[in-house]
Amino acid sequence: MDIEAFIHGGSGGGDADADHPLGIFSAADLSGFGFADSSTITGGIPNHIWPQSQNLNARHPAVSTTIESQSSICAAASPTSATNLNMKESQTLGGTSGSDSESESLLDIEGGPCEQSTNPLDVKRVRRMVSNRESARRSRKRKQAHLADLESQVDQLRGENASLFKQLTDANQQFTTSVTDNRILKSDVEALRVKVKMAEDMVARGALSCGLGHLGGLSPALNPRQACRVPDVLAGLDYAGDDPFTAGLSQPEQLQMPGGEVVDAWGWDNHPNGGMSK
């Protein structure tokens, strides 16, 4: 009944038609109706109308906000986590496999939320970090193996150097001894040469004396000293005049030898082979 009265009453009001030419009513005109919510009067959409669409529209911004916040958290946490991992890597340089497993577990813990992110840049960043860490670990192992090999080579070369230095010291000592022995041998050789020369001179003089003694009728078996002493012995003997062997002997005479030595000689005036002149 109220609606019919309102319709009939509204059709006769000129001011109302002037204010609302398109039939749109104000909130004051609709205040007489019993609407449950004031938003219905003001033109809003109440909460009990299209609840599923409203909830769906409300959920999508929340999901996008969560993803963006998670991506921003991962992006913000990536430098910090990388710094922490680099610090741990520098502290555990040259460590065992336990340190590597610890760093990998730490990487898994810190990179877990980022791996769940839908942003491909974050996924690539995490994969690149893992790849760099693995490459660094392999490089450390190669460097450690190369360093151990170099240390073993250094030890071996040091041993060889010590052995060669000892051999060089022994060779120098032997060389010094050989030089000293060579000098001694040279002096001995010079002394022997002098002795040989003296012996040759003595042999030459002895041969000459023996030749002179042979010419004088002396036995050639006598040595030079005995040949030189024979005239002295013969000078002290008494010669018999009737002895045919001593009849031709006269007093000895001195002869000057080429070496400066003076010897005695006897003349054979009555010798059958002839006499020896001075």
Curated annotation (Swiss-Prot):
GO CC annotations on file: nucleus
Pfam families found in the cross-reference section: bZIP_1
Keywords: DNA-binding, Nucleus, Transcription, Transcription regulation
Cell location: Nucleus
Stretch list, region Leucine-zipper: 150-164
Chief place where the protein resides: nucleus
GO molecular function, one term: DNA-binding transcription factor activity
CDD domains with a match to the protein in the record: bZIP_plant_GBF1
Domain bZIP: 122-185
Gene3D superfamilies, alphabetized: 1.20.5.170
SMART domains listed in its UniProt record: BRLZ
Signal sequence coordinates: none
Region (Disordered): 85-119
Domain of life: Eukaryota
The keyword Nucleus appears for this protein: yes
Purpose: Probable transcription factor that binds to the DNA specific sequence 5'-TGAGTCA-3' found in seed storage protein gene promoters.
Protein name: bZIP transcription factor RISBZ4
Lineage of origin: Eukaryota, Viridiplantae, Streptophyta, Embryophyta, Tracheophyta
